């Protein structure tokens, strides 16, 4: 069964009495302006926290910031639940923050590394480097002595390099690079000639100074340019009408009728 709700109608006097009752019983302790005062930074600068006398609020402040909260902040730990601020307050969620204790940690590295470099170690390193360089030089000299490049008179015959490549590939017509260049005249080997003098850049092929010197006399064989006067007048294609008549008379015997227009040639 559904019951309809009727609105409550109060008179002005009844509403005033209810509001006065609420103010007298619930809002009678209104904090003053002095209770809401926040000290400034300049007032906190000279605050003496190391007072000689006993502080009545010392225990309350220590309970407000427990040591576990300070350690958690310094270690960067995330606290999902708010800590217990005072013995009166109960933890929210039914879980308490674990008690943290300071602990000394050893952050030294005890891994064995290379020994410190002293005079004896430097001498040993220098000796090993000298021995390695001597062995490499001896191996290079031995390879240079064992390898002899043949230079036969006829390229490709009685050449050890050619025989090596032929035996390794099975191609009897194969030649080494030096014999190939000599056989097909890719390069011409000749004794080193004397240094040739550098050409004189101030003379041309005819032993004349380059560039030529300017003078008043004109050299022989030079074509002089003919000056032409430039005008804006149009030139006629023919000198007179008789030139056109003479050209057409060569192709036809009938005189040209100049009173009519000439037909276009397709």
Swiss-Prot record:
Region of interest (Interaction with RB1 in competition with E2F1), residue spans: 39-47
Chief place of localization: host cell
Zinc finger (unnamed): 159-179
Residue numbers covered by motif PXDLS motif, CTBP-binding: 255-259
Record key words, sorted: Activator, Early protein, G1/S host cell cycle checkpoint dysregulation by virus, Host nucleus, Host-virus interaction, Inhibition of host innate immune response by virus, Inhibition of host interferon signaling pathway by virus, Inhibition of host NF-kappa-B by virus, Inhibition of host STAT1 by virus, Interferon antiviral system evasion, Metal-binding, Modulation of host cell cycle by virus, Modulation of host E3 ubiquitin ligases by virus, Modulation of host ubiquitin pathway by virus, Oncogene, Transcription, Transcription regulation, Viral immunoevasion, Zinc, Zinc-finger
Pfam families registered for this protein in UniProt: Adeno_E1A
Motif placement: Nuclear localization signal: 261-265
Residue stretches spanning the membrane: none
Quaternary structure and partners: Interacts with host UBE2I; this interaction interferes with polySUMOylation. Interacts with host RB1; this interaction induces the aberrant dissociation of RB1-E2F1 complex thereby disrupting the activity of RB1 and activating E2F1-regulated genes. Interacts with host ATF7; the interaction enhances ATF7-mediated viral transactivation activity which requires the zinc binding domains of both proteins.
Region (Interaction with UBE2I): 75-145
Localization terms from the record: Host nucleus
GO terms, biological process: regulation of DNA-templated transcription; symbiont-mediated perturbation of host cell cycle G1/S transition checkpoint; symbiont-mediated perturbation of host ubiquitin-like protein modification; symbiont-mediated suppression of host innate immune response; symbiont-mediated suppression of host JAK-STAT cascade via inhibition of STAT1 activity; symbiont-mediated suppression of host NF-kappaB cascade; symbiont-mediated suppression of host type I interferon-mediated signaling pathway
Name of this protein: Early E1A protein
Organism: Human adenovirus A serotype 12
Cited InterPro entries: Aden_E1A
GO cellular component entries: host cell nucleus
Any GO molecular function: zinc ion binding
UniProt record similarity statement: Belongs to the adenoviridae E1A protein family.
Motif LXCXE motif, interaction with host RB1 and TMEM173/STING in this chain: 107-111
